[in-house]
Amino acid sequence: EIWLVNHILQQASEDLLPAIWSAKYDASDEKTSLADSFDGLGTIIKSAKDAGEIAAGKGNVVSTGKFTRADIGTQLLNMWRHMPERFRMMNSKLYLPFAMGDLYDDWFADEHPNVHSPKQSPDETGQQFLYGTNGKVEIVRCSGMPENSSFAMLTLQQNVAYGMDKPSDMRTLKAVPADYKFKALGKYVFGTQIATLRSELFCTNGQNVNPLDV
């Protein structure tokens, strides 16, 4: 019984990770999956774009088009250089799909085959930083985005938030007495948010997390 409870909790945690970007809240009775229970970061960004809160005119979009092996490093560096000087003096995070992280590695290998400077080479460091930023921009590879997504988001770590009612909610499952069957009940209250979309602290490249979203 203890093993089964732990297994269920582990599965719930694994299901939550990819949903952080792709989840879309739906209150319909037939929508009961984790991906229907809250708005993920990608959904929040898409809604803000539709509302005009994320736009080139607002200064928080640097259009890159679809990334390629030949240009991804240059395009990402352009995003960072677009930001105000005060932002560039701070440590920031660059959120990418896993596949785009791999594409960046390929670009780096092509452009800088003999560079092994600290905080620069993907093969030399435990943390990967965007080349040309002097270690100011850490690349964060994110689960839950489609492989063909060219999405990129640059901001401060503290600007991206998630929260739950109590952290213990995701670690608590109560068994319910029942004959011949194992039943258990659990609950969670979870949500994601971007604190501000102001161009001084936030920038995206105009691509949706899910390329099929229009």
Question: Which residues are covered by each model-predicted region?
Answer:
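Short low-polarity hydrophobic stretches
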Residues: 8, 94-97, 139, 184
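Sequence/fold signature of self-assembling virion shell proteins
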Residues: 36-70, 102-214
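Alpha-helical scaffold segments that mediate packing/assembly in large oligomeric complexes
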Residues: 1-78
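Short glycine-rich, low-complexity/disordered patches
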Residues: 18-28, 88-92, 119-122
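Residues at beta-strand starts and edge strands
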Residues: 2, 90, 178-182
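Charged, low-complexity, helix-prone segments enriched in Lys/Glu/Asp/Gln
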Residues: 12-19, 99-111
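C-terminal interaction module
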Residues: 70-107, 118
